[in-house]
Amino acid sequence: LHQAMPDKAPAEGTSCLWNPALMGGHGLVPDAEFGDATPFAVGLFHTGGTGARPLKDGLSATAFPSGVRNTPVEINESIAPIIVWRKDYRMDSGGAGEFRGGTGQIMEIASSENAPFAIAAAFDRVHHAPRGREGGLDGFTGRVELTSGEILRNKGTQTIPRGDPLHLEMPGGGGYGNPLKR
């Protein structure tokens, strides 16, 4: 679209939603001792930033093109045995530009029962940053890891061990236009 209409197409954004599908308890975490943990499966709706537009900044923590918003963490915590220890904007993750890219988010998620759980990851923009347009800078790539620093895959089912919460850094959108014109 950018090649056909460069003055109308936004910079690149987070791409797909960052919806961690979490599950735990008997039979749901194949390589972990689950003990008497409560069985659960829950999908969380969260995302990073959109790309900046030709005349406006990108939207922070908002999906493009649908505009899907985030699920309040209190809802997730009330329906599954998880606790969200952190949910912040990922400062400066949007690319610089005359119009800056939207910022991503940082989330840290653990079991409220101190039990292992699993994540079914399907995240994009981990290896390739959302590109800026017309001189705008790229947004930050996403990260999927444990709070201990162990890097996880951005695709596939993986176990989050007891006592080492999941740490997600969602991408920021690319900037649009020369940052010196801001």
Language-model region placement:
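Glycine/proline-enriched, intrinsically flexible loops and inter-domain linkers
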Residues: L1-R182
